[in-house]
Amino acid sequence: MMSRNQGQPQSGYTQLLEGSFLATARAVNIDVHHKHCYHIAKFIRGKTTVQAIDYLERVMRKQDAIPYTRRSRKGKGGNTMAGHRKGKMGPGAYPYKASREFIRLINSAMDNARQRYDTIDPDEMVITHVAAHRGQISRGFRPRARGRATPKNHYQVNLEIFIEHFGEEVEEDEF
């Protein structure tokens, strides 16, 4: 794993591109909350592309929720509590915008796989790596009383995904 400067936005992929049948996609400076992207990435890692897209579409329709495991209780960061959802999930939410961006990213990786490998079905590929890193910060301020000001920053997110096929390559018969 490559090291990165924590104070600066991530440039390029964070993992080495190693794998026999590997396809990648990257989205830069997306206007979505980093917390939502982190939890979606953690949830879809290890699933096939079709399973991930189907689940995220159900999240967009508010039929299934994304489980929230970090920053879901009261604490130093303020009240960021997420309510418990149906089933044995615990805290979770329905992040619409982040789900839409992840569906676009997965479809982009599948298109890249179709371009690169003619004999592999991208629907059967597995998501081996997915990450959400903080992107650019547009700094601003809000004037307050008595000459003070409070920061009003706009945060963006960089997303990356690797999908991989683990089976044997299917040979097509040529006539």
Language model feature labels by segment:
Residues V32, A145-R146:
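Short, solvent-exposed beta-edge and connector elements
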Residues I120-P143:
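Extended, charged amphipathic interaction segments
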Residues R70-S72, A145, Q156:
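Solvent-exposed, flexible loop/coil residues
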Residues G147-F175:
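C-terminal edge-of-domain segments
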Residues M2-D121, V126, I163, E172-D173:
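Ribosome large-subunit tunnel/peptidyl-transferase-proximal elements
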